[in-house]
Amino acid sequence: MALTVNVVGPAPWGFRISGGRDFHTPIIVTKVTERGKAEAADLRPGDIIVAINGESAESMLHAEAQSKIRQSASPLRLQLDRSQTASPGQINGEGSLDMLATRFQGSLRTHHNSQSSQRSACFSPASLSPRPDSPFSTPPPTSPIALSGENVIGCSFQSLTHSPGLAATHHLTYPGQPTSQQAGHSSPSDSTVRVLLHSPGRPSSPRLSSLDLEEDSEVFKMLQENRQGRAAPRQSSSFRLLQEALEAEERGGTPAFVPSSLSPKASLPTSRALATPPKLHTCEKCSVNISNQAVRIQEGRYRHPGCYTCADCGLNLKMRGHFWVGNELYCEKHARQRYSMPGTLSSQA
């Protein structure tokens, strides 16, 4: 449907476009701002812009169309091609609630039709027709296709026919009629489809059509948890050796060797080292054990750093060196005062 829209300005006009000759698509309105100038002029998302101010937009690039719209004077005259299915409540590229509900119902209807076609294919008259010599040659009045709420296992007639183990256990059973075992006609060539009749209110579940459990199903997870719960807890080898050593020690025997860092043999040197305290030096000046830093004066002679001072002035000799005068330590100044001859001094730096 062709129509013309006049958007009263000035810019900005309140809508966005996409497409162009460089995108090989027509120029389409993709978004309309709520309560804007474009919405007031009845411009809608999905409208195809045919001409801008009388100039054809078919051969325009995207940037060229944007520039012409932005630089246009008021009013902006747009010739549009609007689809008949465009919803008037569509805003910013999203449909209204009515349109979304219609699409959702259509998808549900399509899904329901596909399921119905699959069920009718599984239970076609050719696949459900019994053999002439089978006990079900006379079909019951109620057809299994007409029953609602049935859960069907084994839709594929061909796959069950090629499986003798499954063919012997899956038979078409009806209420009030004897089975093939009761009639004495148990053979793998009988009908290989079994229909379980339930209450009409329960819908059919397509997941029951598989004989194998899926790994992500709740039933499979529950079975795995039950198996893990019944399994005996595993004991590590190191814990088992430690338990045997403790039991042997309780019985009064020789404890077994545990090959780990916690074994008695491995911890023996550590215990001896902790039992023997380190040897402490004794300060020769104050006769107190030196527990931290010690100053070694001569072999076997140590002092505290605070006791390593001049005997006359108390100056610390750590950075200056000491001079012996008898058995006392002096600095160089007071040592020279006690002896006039330098040769009598005994110095050590």
UniProtKB/Swiss-Prot annotation:
Organism of origin: Rattus norvegicus (Rat)
Compartments in which it is found: Cytoplasm; Cytoplasm, Cytoskeleton
CC annotations in GO: adherens junction; cortical actin cytoskeleton; filamentous actin; stress fiber; Z disc
First and last residue of the signal peptide: none
Gene Ontology annotations of biological process type: actin cytoskeleton organization; heart development; muscle structure development; protein catabolic process
Modified residues (Phosphoserine): 124, 127, 129, 134, 137, 143, 163, 199, 204-205, 209-210, 263
Chief place where the protein resides: cytoplasm
Keywords, sorted A to Z: Cytoplasm, Cytoskeleton, LIM domain, Metal-binding, Phosphoprotein, Zinc
Composition skew (Low complexity), residue ranges: 199-211
Gene3D superfamilies: 2.30.42.10, Cysteine Rich Protein (2.10.110.10)
UniProt tissue specificity: Highly expressed in cornea and lung. Expressed at intermediate level in sclera and combined tissues of the eye irido-corneal angle. Specifically expressed in the corneal epithelial cells but not in other corneal layers.
The protein's name in its UniProt record: PDZ and LIM domain protein 2
Pfam families, sorted: DUF4749, LIM, PDZ
Subunit-level organization: Interacts with alpha-actinins ACTN1 and ACTN4, FLNA and MYH9. Interacts (via LIM zinc-binding domain) with MKRN2.
Its job: Probable adapter protein located at the actin cytoskeleton that promotes cell attachment. Necessary for the migratory capacity of epithelial cells. Overexpression enhances cell adhesion to collagen and fibronectin and suppresses anchorage independent growth. May contribute to tumor cell migratory capacity.
Region (Disordered): 72-95, 108-147, 168-212, 250-272
Residue spans of biased composition, Polar residues class: 81-90, 108-121, 176-192, 260-270
